[in-house]
C-alpha cells in the first residue's frame, strides 16, 4: 500500500509484479489460510477473523492518521499492535491451542507474541534512522514523510529546533536535507526515548514468558526477544 520497492531487504511483490498481482496474491493467501483453518474448528476460524479485523483496522488508522486530540504516540503504538502485534499473537495462540496447553498458557503466549511484534516494529523505527546494515536504506521513512516513533518524540519535544521540526513535518526528498535530518535525529534525545519504549515492550514479552515451564521452546523465545530488542542497538 505504501508503494515500497523493498520489504525486509527483498524486492516487494508490488514492485516486481505490480499492485494488481500483489493485492490478489494477498487475497489468495487469506483465502487459502481460511480453507486450512476450517478443518481445525470454529475457534481457529474465529482467531483468524479477529486477527484480520485488527489488521485492517490498523491499516485504516495508519492511513487516516491520529484524529482530533488523539495522542500521535499512542496512536502509533496502537497501529503497530494491530498491524504486526496481532499477527504474531495469532501465530503464538495457534501453536498453544494445537499443543493442548491451558487457556492461561495460551493467553500468555499470545500476549508474548503481541509484545514482541510491537518491539520488532519499534526496532524497525530506530533502524530506519541509525543503521546502515538493516536491510533497508536509512531514512526511507523520512523520505516518505512517515512519522516513526523517534520522529514523533522529536516533534513532541519543545526543545526541538525549528529547523528540524520543519524538516520532520513533511516528506524529505532533497538529499542534503535528508542527510541533515538524519544527522540531527541521531543525536536527539528522541532516540533514547524510543529505545526506552522498545525495551518496555521487550520486558513485557520476557515477563509473559516468566511463568512458563522451562523448556527448549521457552529458551528459544527468550533468545528471540533479545535478537529483536538488540538489533536496534
Residue ranges and their predicted role:
Residues 1-233:
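All-alpha prenyltransferase/terpene-synthase fold signal
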